[in-house]
From Swiss-Prot:
Record PTM N-acetylalanine, positions in chain: 2
Pfam families linked to this entry: Dynactin_p22
GO biological process: cytoskeleton-dependent cytokinesis; microtubule-based process
Coiled-coil ranges from the UniProt annotation: 46-66
GO CC entries: centrosome; cleavage furrow; cytosol; dynactin complex; kinetochore; microtubule associated complex; midbody; nucleolus
Stored InterPro entries: DCTN3 (IPR009991)
Protein name: Dynactin subunit 3
Species this chain originates from: Mus musculus (Mouse)
């Protein structure tokens, strides 16, 4: 039964191929694709039996397919022992990655929690708070600059007053010294 369905499936595929080749009108005359394929196979068989080099090529097709396989270079270039050594050399890194993946796996319920799922709902509030924070930072910078200017003014005033007091103190000392000297002269 299965062989019959395989034959029917193959027949339908050949008919579809004929429609592709010959168009929707069907086959032209009595030529069918299957007949052409049989003729090509017979011709190739005749050529192969007559030519020794072609026989050798047919035998080496499997080798050619094996060599064309992209993984073939990896199998030849890196022997199994080297692959094993590479894996063993990276053992600590692999184990650390496993531990990290286990931590992520353990935290998956947190990611699936209602709080995390509600984040999009709070995005507008967060954006508004971020704008307020930026405004407050700007205000803080302005207040800092203003405070710095006031402190510089205070320091200048204090320094000028200190210099003035020092000058007055020196003048007072000179006047007191002159006053003490005058009575002694009389």
């Amino acid at each position: 039964m299965a062989a019959l369905t395989d034959v029917q499936r193959l027949q339908s595929r050949v008919e579809e191929l004929e429609r592709w080749v010959y168009g929707p009108g069907g086959t032209r005359g009595s030529r069918k694709v299957a007949d052409g394929l049989v003729k090509v196979q017979v011709a190739l068989g005749n050529i192969a039996s007559k030519r020794e080099r072609v026989k050798i090529l047919y035998k080496k097709i499997e080798d050619l397919i094996k060599y064309l396989d992209p993984e073939y270079i990896d199998r030849i270039a890196i022997p199994e022992a080297s692959k094993l050594q590479f894996i063993l050399a990276e053992e600590q890194f692999i184990l650390s990655q496993v531990a990290l993946l286990e931590q992520v796996n353990a935290l998956v319920p947190v990611l699936d929690s209602a709080s995390i799922k509600a984040v999009p709902e709070h995005a507008a509030r967060l954006q508004r708070l971020a704008q307020i924070h930026i405004q407050q930072q700007d205000q803080c910078v302005a207040i800092t600059e203003e405070s710095k200017a006031l402190l510089e003014g205070y320091n200048k005033t204090t320094m000028l007053l200190s210099k003035q007091f020092v000058q007055w103190d020196e003048l007072l000392c000179q006047l007191e010294a002159a006053k003490q000297v005058k009575p002694a002269e009389e």
